[in-house]
């Protein structure tokens, strides 16, 4: 950008080394720690804590902040740790400096050996990690040496006692021979006793193993018997549950059947009542239709009678012969059938009258 770039002005502070905050005694934290019993120069942390013995001078210094500008892990540093920061050929140079300073060859060799041991330790740590050797116990063979030595000492003590009691050299020689002959006996007896002990131990182990096997078999039988009992009980319980379920199902089915029968009967009754009501309504409608039809027919008959009377008057005037209407000869019935009978009588009269037929069939009368 050059001169046209934005200018960033940096103002130097009065405390370039950033030591003002460490020397400030008026801050809140400094005053609070003083009120709790801390004095400048003491370690940070509780004095009576379990880890107080591990406090060092670092606990008295300030907490320093370091900017992390690498890809290493937290707390890792380049050139620190085991095997880091060593120069090749430095051992030979240190030996040369030691000789020039007047050190003896023994001291130089000792230092060289220490450096070589350090290199071996570094290599082993890199390859297998930290190794610690722990001292184990002493391996004991088949023979118990302490018991054999004790037996020999006891035999020697017996020999000394017998030699003191005997006075003659012959008796001493004979006693020595006898004791020499007897001396291997306790060892053999000891060996025999050890063999017997071993045999007894083996027999005890066999008997214990047999007992354990018998116990295991008895336990297995008991467990099998218990399992059989549990299975039989479970089967019985299942059967009882099935019986209960079947009974409950039968009762429920019978109840449902009774309910269904009652519902069917109620439906039948309702259907019968509906049919009766429909029949009654139909009969009532038919009666009303008959009454309406009879009223209409009576009106029509009255009109026809008027037409007949008019036609009869005309014919009487023309022909001058009176027309006599024939009576049905039947008495008018009373009741519901009277309307029907009237309608039938009117039809008969109309069919017998020529003028009315002409009017019905739209035939003009001849004048």
From Swiss-Prot:
Entry-linked InterPro entries: G_patch_dom (IPR000467), PINX1 (IPR050656)
Molecular function terms from GO: nucleic acid binding
Keyword Acyltransferase attributed: no
Main subcellular localisation: nucleus
UniProt biased composition (Basic residues): 209-221, 236-248, 265-277, 297-309
Presence of keyword Protease: no
Compositionally biased intervals (Polar residues): 15-27
Ranges of residues in domain G-patch: 25-79
GO cellular component terms, A-Z: nucleolus
Extent of Acidic residues compositional bias: 167-182
An individual GO BP term: rRNA processing
Subcellular location: Nucleus, Nucleolus
Region (Disordered): 1-28, 156-336
SMART domains registered for this protein in UniProt: G_patch (SM00443)
Biased composition annotated in UniProt, kind: Low complexity: 282-296, 310-328
Keywords associated with the record: Nucleus, Ribosome biogenesis, rRNA processing
Family according to the record: Belongs to the PINX1 family.
Chain's role: Involved in rRNA-processing at A0, A1 and A2 sites and negatively regulates telomerase.
Protein name: Protein pxr1
Organism: Sclerotinia sclerotiorum (strain ATCC 18683 / 1980 / Ss-1) (White mold)
């Amino acid at each position: 950008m050059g001169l046209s770039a934005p200018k960033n002005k940096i103002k130097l502070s009065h405390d370039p080394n950033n030591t003002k905050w460490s020397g400030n005694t008026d801050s809140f934290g400094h005053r609070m720690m003083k009120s709790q019993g801390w004095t400048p120069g003491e370690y940070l942390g509780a004095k009576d804590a379990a880890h107080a013995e591990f406090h060092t001078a670092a606990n008295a210094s300030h907490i320093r902040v370091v900017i992390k500008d690498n890809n290493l892990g937290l707390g890792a540093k380049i050139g620190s740790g085991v095997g880091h920061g060593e120069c090749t050929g430095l051992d030979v140079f240190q030996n040369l400096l030691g000789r020039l300073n007047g050190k003896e060859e023994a001291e130089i060799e000792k230092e060289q050996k220490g450096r070589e041991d350090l290199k071996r330790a570094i290599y082993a740590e890199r390859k297998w990690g930290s190794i610690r050797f722990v001292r184990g116990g002493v391996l004991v063979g088949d023979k118990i040496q302490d018991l054999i030595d004790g037996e020999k000492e006891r035999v020697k003590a017996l020999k000394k006692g017998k030699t003191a009691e005997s006075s003659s050299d012959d008796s001493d020689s004979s006693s020595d021979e006898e004791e020499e002959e007897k001396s291997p006996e306790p060892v053999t007896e000891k060996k025999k006793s050890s063999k017997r002990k071993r045999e007894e131990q083996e027999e005890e182990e066999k008997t214990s193993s047999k007992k354990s096997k018998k116990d295991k078999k008895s336990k297995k039988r008991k467990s099998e018997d218990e399992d059989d009992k549990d299975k039989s009980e479970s089967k019985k319980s299942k059967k009882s549950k099935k019986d209960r379920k079947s009974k409950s199902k039968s009762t429920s089915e019978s109840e449902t059947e009774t309910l269904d029968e009652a519902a069917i009967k109620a439906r039948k009754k309702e259907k019968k009542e509906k049919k009766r009501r429909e029949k009654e309504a139909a009969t009532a409608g038919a009666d009303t239709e008959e009454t309406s039809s009879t009223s209409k027919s009576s009106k029509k008959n009255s009109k026809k009678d008027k037409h007949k009377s008019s036609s009869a008057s005309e014919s009487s005037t023309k022909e001058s012969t009176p027309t006599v209407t024939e009576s049905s000869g039947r008495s008018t019935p009373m009741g519901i059938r009277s309307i029907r009978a009237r309608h039938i009588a009117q039809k008969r009269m109309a069919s017998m009258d020529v003028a009315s037929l002409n009017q019905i069939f739209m035939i003009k009368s001849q004048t």
